[in-house]
């Protein structure tokens, strides 16, 4: 059910916005979930993928292969290229195979100060969400008086 009258649910409009999205919005769309260990550590579910992150493919033809580094994030095609995920062309050269970021799990993040800030911000907002709607002990005591 639609709640916000200013957000469209028209399929053609959503597809248009997806395929004509500018680069800074494509970055957000191209997010990948974090592995269970990283999720526990940072209290964050997913992050926009970037070059030099280590990922594991969990869906499709190349799933279950060893962990590889992200070589390139190709925002125009909505794909990422991973170190060991390659195939041989008819003329014998090897090329990277494009994989959608939603089909991989991030196993190691390349951290810099900006990315750490993003992780802290996301974890903080998640913590606020967990406490939302819960009464504190003091307020319960005041209500009972």
From Swiss-Prot:
GO cellular-component term (any)? synapse
**By its UniProt entry, which SUPFAM superfamilies does this protein fall under?**
Translation proteins SH3-like domain
Residues annotated as region Disordered? 1-21, 122-145
Q: Where in the cell is it found?
A: Cytoplasm
Please give the chief subcellular localization of this protein. Answer: cytoplasm
Keyword Signal applies? no
Q: What does this protein do?
A: Component of the large ribosomal subunit. The ribosome is a large ribonucleoprotein complex responsible for the synthesis of proteins in the cell.
Task: Report the PTM annotation.
Answer: Ufmylated by UFL1 in response to endoplasmic reticulum stress, promoting reticulophagy of endoplasmic reticulum sheets.
In the record, Phosphothreonine modifications are located at 139
InterPro entries per UniProt:
KOW, Rib_uL2_dom2, Ribosomal_uL24_CS, Ribosomal_uL24_euk/arc, Ribosomal_uL24_KOW, Translation_prot_SH3-like_sf
Annotated GO molecular function terms are:
mRNA 5'-UTR binding; RNA binding; structural constituent of ribosome
Q: What is this protein called?
A: Large ribosomal subunit protein uL24
């Amino acid at each position: 059910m639609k709640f916000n009258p200013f957000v469209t649910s028209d399929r053609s409009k959503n597809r248009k916005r997806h395929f004509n999205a500018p680069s800074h919005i494509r970055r957000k769309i191209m997010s990948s979930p974090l592995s269970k260990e990283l999720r526990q550590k940072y209290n964050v579910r997913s992050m926009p993928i970037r070059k030099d992150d280590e990922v594991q493919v969990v869906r499709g033809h190349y799933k279950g292969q060893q962990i590889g580094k992200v070589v390139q994030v190709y925002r125009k095609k909505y794909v990422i290229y991973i170190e060991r995920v390659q195939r041989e062309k008819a003329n014998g050269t090897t090329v990277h195979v494009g994989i959608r970021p939603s089909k991989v799990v991030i196993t190691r993040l390349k951290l810099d100060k900006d990315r750490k800030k993003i992780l802290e911000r996301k974890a903080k907002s998640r913590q606020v969400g967990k406490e939302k709607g819960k009464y504190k002990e003091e307020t319960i005591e005041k209500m009972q008086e």
